[in-house]
Amino acid sequence: MSFMVSEEVTVKEGGPRMIVTGYSSGMVECRWYDGYGVKREAFHETELVPGEGSRPAE
């Protein structure tokens, strides 16, 4: 599944709601606020699922 920039996602195993900020070669860059600052990390697209605020499936 590919994600679009600005889409909301979460890690399949659970975790914070994150916003997609980039996508390249199957890796999805996400950012989120952890209560102290903005965090950034890249995940393989298979590790993520669409969040509540995501676009409907086509």
Where are these regions (language model features)?
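Basic/aromatic-rich interaction segments and small domains that mediate binding to polyanionic partners
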Residues: 4, 8-52, 57-58
